[in-house]
């Protein structure tokens, strides 16, 4: 069996429940068979214009049930971010497995021109990834590493 067939077999075993809150809502779709993220579409009654350096909360018209042990991560779509300057305001949105409300995308306009978003536009992508929730253990000391407390470029500039 080739890699694509193996991947499809694994994916086909996992299901994520999606509920339309609006009959016009479009279910998330994968652009290709090997896409990691599913495109999220906005569900709007009328176009929304996002002014420069402003944020708009855009509904998808969907609620999802992320499987237990996983999280939904909402990322920018590269084309929308690079070509139009539109990306999630919080950089990465997190959808917890116990959240059942409408999925919304807080879209920020990083550019100098107003941008209009219309019903059915793909505005973000959803990745479903394993999520660990370890118990926090307070300690007096942490083990030493070669890196130590170096951060923010401490491992090199390139």
Indicate residue ranges for each PLM-predicted region.
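DUTPase catalytic domain/fold
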Residues: 1-158
């Amino acid at each position: 069996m080739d890699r694509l067939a193996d991947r499809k077999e694994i994916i086909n075993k996992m299901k994520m429940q999606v509920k339309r809150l609006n009959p016009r809502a479009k279910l998330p779709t994968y652009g290709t068979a090997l896409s990691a993220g599913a495109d999220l579409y906005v569900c709007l009654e009328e176009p929304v214009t996002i002014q420069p350096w402003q944020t708009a909360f855009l509904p998808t018209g969907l609620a999802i049930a992320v499987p237990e042990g996983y999280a939904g991560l909402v990322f920018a779509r590269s084309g929308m971010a690079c070509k139009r300057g539109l990306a999630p305001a919080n950089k990465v949105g997190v959808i917890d497995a116990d959240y059942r409300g409408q999925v919304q995308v807080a879209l920020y306009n990083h550019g100098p021109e107003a941008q209009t978003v219309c019903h059915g536009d793909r505005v973000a992508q959803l990745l479903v990834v394993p999520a660990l929730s370890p118990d926090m253990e307070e300690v007096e000391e942490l083990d030493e590493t070669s890196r130590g407390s170096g951060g923010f470029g401490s491992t090199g500039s390139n």
